[in-house]
């Protein structure tokens, strides 16, 4: 047995081998050490008496899925080795085979899957300046590919990979340096030969990682998942194309949009091959592949997704305060995944967006229809993943029942949609297949409430199989049959004392006394002679015995055969089931958006092909849900001419960042197909939303907060377009005042003036000097978030109005934060001195300026604006330096005033002078 284990382990290095022994999965040698540690189970040993004990640990087979899930979530690959023959039918070592390898990117068991999130396996490859990537969710069959060419190709593909957030990324070993450059990680190479020679690196975190192990993407700032290098020979273009052609059963890949997309084809083939090898199955449910380009959807990079808190809140304690949580009213897993996809990749096609708006509008208007649809959809299972399990050979009895129950709801759903006017809802209705044949097959063959596992028996309905019914009857009625047979033999032989008995040695036999032995019929076969009795058997008894003793075993075997046959029959209708699943998912998503619109008072936006972005009384969709007071709505107007750069000033905590974020969220909601939180909205179709908000460092890459800020800003300046929306919040605050102001000024000016980069921009800042730009830039406008003072306290009004703010009210915010009164008093004193000194400097500068104007000094409008901003900044800096010097030395002045020279000795005066000298700045 140990030799068998070692042979299988040698065929699957880089995995933890779950070796089936009876009712347990056992791990041996190093695998046992790792398994015991990671699963926190007892580590024991085999052959202790020999002096060379073999470490081992094990888990019960009935709960193994949970243990496997723990290991895979930690980055391990698990090879599942099963007994593939009946131990009772062989005297040799039972045959065992690895039936599946579970990796982070190829899970199909529910314990390893998030019901409301996709689980992607990704692959990336490159030739020259062409880079291809593919994304496969083996649990549902969703398959996508893309390709980029040129100097920026790696950045573009890296952005796609970030967006899809794969659990595992495959790549050629030779690309390790580029992977490191693109994702900030250093993958190591190794080998994991699979069935056809597929080679991946070995797996296992922590110390295992130091020896040819995988590298977790959590070491990178942009991805979380497992990096898996594969041998270069597996990435041959010709072989890859033929693999896909054969799998899809076509003559060419041109129909999938993959013509002349060599790198995309190679990446897609790598994904498919890896999935087939790990699952030991053909993956027939992967029946299509979609080629996409970045311009096919509104681009939201990971920075924007994080900053806008689209799917996850930034604060650990605010995990539920993300946009997706607020708008997700879906009632099926597949609907939830589709809604999430719409949010992360909104459409840029007006027809598609307005079709979703139309569906939401109809469902929004009909409360009864919407509630009835949601009630029916709640009974629909995750048909996408259920179909995946059917095709991968891992479906359970209750999966088929769930499929039947789900399909039973389709006629009702179709009836509800029949009288609607919306084009999209009619298309969905036509896509719904009632699959009456599949429903009938399952209803006639599978019990309504079968056990969880097939081996528990009782899965196949009575009446479906005559042989199975006979076996069950035989098993249930064994005692009655024995009594009837015994009575029959007594009557036939005339021996009243004849008995039919059973023991473990001879099985069933007929026993008669010695006195009656001569009266037995001639067809009786002697089995055993005892002192006072004879034991016989008959052909009929032997036949019945064989049936009874093998009935339970045969029942399970026959049920398994019938169940497998039914699964194969249902799987032949995969295309029809998937089409219905997609339609139900879409219906769930638009119904969810309608429900959200009703609950949150959202309105239908007007989409257009122009450049005007107008939101009237817009609200932040997340903040308004979680605050205890009425949300203050604000209106925003942007275009690409007169209002393309809005410079927003205002107090801390006033709501500048909220206005920025809510504007972007409203645009994203509209383009995903949702209604929006506003009184009204007229919106253009954006190509990308850029954000530079918040403060964060990247110590793993040696990047400071300011470096991260500048890197993100540089990406915006290089890639923004007139169709983009840019949010800039406090650019330049991470460095010295003059440096920061200079950078902020230049960034705003660049976005305004550059014809190819003049995106619609919201620029929030505390550099009030930037408000001077609005006087010379034709497309710049000043806005402020208002506040007022009442009875000595600041009241934040949170209203966005035209104009520039004069104060930041930072000390008031510090008071609200709980700063000690003494510190607040000192801060007010310092501020008063700074402001007084600034006014003095300003008065002197005004006199100089007036003198210069009197002698005819002139300057251009542009120079004047920049000069005023520079003067204001210089005045602030000079005031700070001079006044702070005075404040710091105030203690010295106070001590000198209190000193009385007439009463001091020479030594005391000398000591005081020395102490004061040490205090001078």
Located regions from the model:
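Conserved phosphate-binding elements of NTP-dependent enzyme cores
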Residues: 3-7, 14, 567, 574-577, ...
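Intracellular alpha-helical coupling/juxtamembrane segments of multi-pass membrane proteins
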Residues: 353-356, 376, 380, 475-478, ...
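C-terminal tails and terminal domains of large nucleic-acid-associated
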Residues: 886-921
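Amphipathic heptad-repeat alpha-helical coiled-coil/stalk segments that mediate oligomerization
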Residues: 235-239, 298-304, 310, 314-315, ...
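ATPase nucleotide-binding head domains, primarily ABC-like/P-loop NTPase cores
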Residues: 29-30, 261, 331, 342, ...
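Active-site phosphate-binding and catalytic loops of NTP-dependent enzymes
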Residues: 79-81, 104-113, 282, 418-424, ...
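Conserved catalytic alpha/beta cores of large enzymes that bind or transform nucleotide phosphates
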Residues: 161, 166-172, 180-183, 541-571, ...
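Charged catalytic and DNA/RNA-contacting regions of genome-maintenance
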Residues: 1-193, 207-362, 371, 378-391, ...
């Amino acid at each position: 047995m140990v030799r068998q284990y070692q042979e299988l382990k040698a065929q699957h290095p880089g995995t933890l081998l779950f070796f089936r022994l009876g009712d347990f999965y056992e791990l041996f040698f190093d695998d046992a050490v790792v398994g015991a540690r990671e699963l926190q189970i007892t580590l024991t040993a085999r052959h202790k008496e020999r002096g060379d004990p073999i470490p081992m640990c094990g888990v019960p087979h009935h709960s193994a899925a949970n243990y496997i899930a723990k290991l895979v979530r930690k980055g391990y690959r698990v090879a599942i080795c099963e007994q593939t023959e009946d131990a009772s039918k062989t005297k040799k070592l039972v045959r065992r085979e690895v039936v599946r390898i579970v990796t982070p990117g190829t899970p199909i068991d529910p314990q390893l899957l998030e019901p409301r999130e996709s689980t992607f396996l990704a692959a990336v490859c490159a030739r020259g300046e062409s880079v291809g990537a593919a994304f496969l969710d083996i649990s549902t069959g969703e398959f996508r590919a893309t390709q980029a060419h040129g100097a920026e190709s790696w950045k573009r593909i890296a952005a796609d990979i970030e967006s899809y957030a794969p659990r595992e990324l495959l790549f050629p070993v030779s690309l390790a340096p580029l992977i490191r450059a693109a994702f900030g990680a250093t993958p190591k190479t190794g080998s994991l030969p699979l069935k056809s020679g597929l080679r991946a690196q070995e797996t296992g975190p922590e110390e295992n990682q130091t020896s040819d192990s995988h590298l977790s993407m959590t070491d990178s700032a942009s991805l979380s998942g497992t990096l898996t290098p594969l041998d270069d020979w597996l990435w041959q273009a010709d072989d890859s194309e033929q693999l896909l052609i054969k799998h899809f059963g076509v003559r060419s890949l041109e129909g999938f949009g993959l013509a002349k997309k060599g790198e995309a084809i190679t990446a897609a083939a790598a994904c498919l091959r890896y999935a087939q090898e790990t699952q030991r199955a053909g993956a027939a449910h992967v029946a299509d592949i979609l080629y996409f380009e970045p311009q096919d959807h509104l681009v939201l990079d990971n920075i924007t997704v994080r900053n806008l808190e689209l799917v996850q809140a930034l604060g650990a304690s605010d995990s539920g305060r993300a946009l997706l949580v607020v708008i997700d009213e879906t009632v099926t897993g597949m609907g939830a995944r589709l809604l999430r996809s719409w949010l992360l990749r909104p459409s840029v096609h007006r027809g598609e967006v307005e079709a979703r708006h139309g569906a939401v509008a109809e469902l929004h208007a009909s409360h009864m229809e919407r509630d009835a649809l949601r009630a029916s959809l709640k009974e629909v299972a995750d048909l996408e993943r259920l179909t995946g399990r059917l095709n991968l050979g891992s479906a359970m009895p209750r999966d088929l029942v769930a499929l039947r129950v789900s399909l039973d709801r389709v006629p009702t759903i179709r009836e509800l949609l029949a009288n609607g006017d919306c084009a999209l809802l009619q298309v969905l209705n036509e896509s719904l297949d009632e699959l009456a044949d599949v429903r009938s097959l399952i209803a006639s063959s599978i019990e309504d409430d079968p056990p969880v596992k097939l081996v528990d028996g009782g899965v196949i309905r009575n009446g479906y199989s005559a042989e199975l019914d006979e076996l069950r009857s035989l098993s249930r009625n064994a005692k009655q049959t024995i009594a009837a047979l015994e009575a029959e033999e007594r009557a036939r032989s005339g021996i009243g004392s004849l008995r039919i008995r059973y023991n473990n040695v001879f099985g069933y036999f007929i026993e008669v006394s010695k006195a009656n032995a001569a009266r037995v019929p001639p067809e009786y076969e002697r089995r055993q002679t005892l002192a006072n009795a004879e034991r016989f058997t008959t052909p009929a008894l032997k036949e019945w015995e064989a049936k009874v003793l093998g009935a339970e075993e045969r029942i399970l075997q026959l049920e398994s055969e019938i169940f497998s046959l039914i699964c194969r029959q249902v799987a032949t209708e995969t295309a029809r089931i998937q089409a219905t699943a997609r339609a139900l998912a879409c219906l769930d998503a638009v119904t969810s958006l309608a429900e959200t619109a009703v609950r949150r008072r959202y309105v239908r936006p007007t989409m257009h092909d122009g450049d005007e972005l107008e939101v009237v009384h817009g609200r932040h969709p997340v903040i308004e849900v979680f605050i205890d007071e009425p949300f203050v709505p604000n209106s925003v107007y942007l275009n690409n001419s007169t209002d393309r750069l809005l410079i927003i000033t205002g107090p801390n905590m006033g709501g500048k960042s909220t206005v920025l974020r809510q504007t972007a969220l409203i645009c994203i909601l509209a383009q995903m197909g949702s209604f929006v939180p506003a009184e009204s909205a007229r919106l253009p179709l954006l190509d990308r939303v850029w954000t530079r908000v918040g403060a964060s460092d990247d110590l793993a890459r040696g990047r400071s907060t300011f470096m991260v800020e500048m890197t993100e800003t540089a990406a915006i300046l290089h890639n923004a377009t007139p169709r983009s929306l840019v949010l800039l919040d406090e650019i330049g605050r991470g460095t010295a005042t003059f440096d920061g102001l200079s950078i902020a000024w230049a960034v705003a000016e660049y976005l305004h003036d550059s014809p190819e980069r003049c995106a619609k921009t919201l620029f929030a800042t505390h550099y009030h000097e930037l408000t001077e730009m609005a006087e010379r830039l034709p497309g710049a406008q000043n806005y402020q978030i208002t506040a007022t003072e009442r009875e000595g306290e600041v009241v934040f009004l949170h209203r966005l109005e035209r104009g520039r703010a004069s104060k930041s009210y930072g000390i008031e915010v510090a008071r609200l934060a709980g700063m000690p009164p003494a510190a607040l008093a000192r801060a007010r004193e310092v501020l008063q001195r700074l402001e007084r000194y600034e006014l003095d400097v300003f008065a002197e500068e005004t006199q100089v300026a007036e003198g210069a104007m009197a002698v005819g000094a002139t300057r251009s409008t542009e120079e004047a604006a920049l000069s005023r901003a520079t003067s204001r900044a210089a005045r602030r800096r000079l005031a700070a330096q001079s006044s702070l010097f005075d404040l710091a030395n105030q203690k010295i002045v106070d001590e000198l005033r209190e000193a009385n020279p007439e009463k001091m000795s020479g030594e005391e005066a000398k000591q005081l002078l020395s102490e004061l000298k040490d205090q001078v700045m």
